[in-house]
Amino acid sequence: MEIVIMIQEALKALRRGEIVLVFDADNRERETDMIVAAEKIKPEHIRIMRNDAGGLICVPVSWENSEKLGIPYMTDIMEEASGRYPVLGKLSPHDIPYDEKSAFSITVNHRKTFTGITDNDRALTIGELAGICRDDRHESFGDLFRSPGHVTLLRAADGHVLRRGGHTEMSIALMEMAGLTGVAVCCEMMDDRTGNSLSTEDAMKYAREHDLIFMSGAELIESYMEFRS
């Protein structure tokens, strides 16, 4: 399938609330993530990610929405608190082998959830977060959510894939190209047999068997650059 056609099919799938698969790069995490639009999230998406992917279910948030929500990078929180808790300074992730900085932010639950971990609770939290970003109600974030929680937020870099080539930014690039709210859901695909990340070949096989779009990060970034030009 030609890249242009494949990307267009992926964007249509995202608008329909379907999952797409994205492999980042051989010189990065070497992982394939399941990605779906946060505003389309349902408990069944959480179940599929939990059972078929098995990694950490996270919520990439665009730089613009992160700024409006006021969510910091976790590393900034740790740095601020290291004066009182010196161990946090020692735990700084300055030696990540595949990147310069972690995208991790805070964890949240919606206040209507119970424990926050069930498929229903996580879908509620994610969907409501996408909703306040879509409707430009960012100021209600603190009233509607509590932290810590069971949904991990990832803060995308300013400029997204033009500045950083992580799944966080690639997820947001897909949302932008699809005309969707700049909040996504992603989960790394793991391999039960090896205990490692699922190989690209097996991820592509999964995509074929489940009629899902699979793309590489290079294809996504190339398409995004054309989209922005």
From Swiss-Prot:
Pathway: Cofactor biosynthesis; riboflavin biosynthesis; 2-hydroxy-3-oxobutyl phosphate from D-ribulose 5-phosphate: step 1/1. Its EC number is 4.1.99.12. D-ribulose 5-phosphate binds at R28, E29, D33, R164, G165, G166, H167, T168, E188. GO terms for molecular function: 3,4-dihydroxy-2-butanone-4-phosphate synthase activity; magnesium ion binding; manganese ion binding. HAMAP family: RibB. Homodimer. Belongs to the DHBP synthase family. This is 3,4-dihydroxy-2-butanone 4-phosphate synthase. It comes from Methanothermobacter thermautotrophicus (strain ATCC 29096 / DSM 1053 / JCM 10044 / NBRC 100330 / Delta H).
